[in-house]
Amino acid sequence: MADDPNKVWPTGLTIAESEELHKHVIDGTRIFGAIAIVAHFLAYVYSPWLH
């Protein structure tokens, strides 16, 4: 197996592939965060003991 100079150790991904993967991870984190903020707001609004 020849070493590919474009692959980055230890993942074996190229820089472009790793940047694309990172973009998807960050997008997923933002979506999760937005859902969590909405869920916490709804829990605050509909929980009488939090007022």
From Swiss-Prot:
**Domain of life per record:** Bacteria
Major localisation: membrane
- Is Zinc-finger one of the keywords? no
Sequence ranges on the Periplasmic membrane side: 47-51
Alphabetic keyword roster: Antenna complex, Bacteriochlorophyll, Cell inner membrane, Cell membrane, Chlorophyll, Chromophore, Light-harvesting polypeptide, Magnesium, Membrane, Metal-binding, Transmembrane, Transmembrane helix
Q: Which Pfam families match?
A: LHC
* Membrane topology, Cytoplasmic segments: 2-23
Give one GO biological process term.
photosynthesis, light reaction
Q: Where are the transmembrane segments?
A: 24-46
**GO terms assigned for molecular function:** bacteriochlorophyll binding; electron transporter, transferring electrons within the cyclic electron transport pathway of photosynthesis activity; metal ion binding
Membrane topology according to the record = Single-pass type II membrane protein
- The parts of the chain that form a coiled coil are none
Carries keyword Cytoplasm? no
GO CC terms in record = plasma membrane; plasma membrane light-harvesting complex
Q: Which SUPFAM superfamilies match?
A: Light-harvesting complex subunits
| Role | Antenna complexes are light-harvesting systems, which transfer the excitation energy to the reaction centers.
Q: How does it assemble?
A: The core complex is formed by different alpha and beta chains, binding bacteriochlorophyll molecules, and arranged most probably in tetrameric structures disposed around the reaction center. The non-pigmented gamma chains may constitute additional components.
**Stated name of the protein:** Light-harvesting protein B-800-850 beta chain B
Gene source species: Rhodopseudomonas palustris (strain ATCC BAA-98 / CGA009)
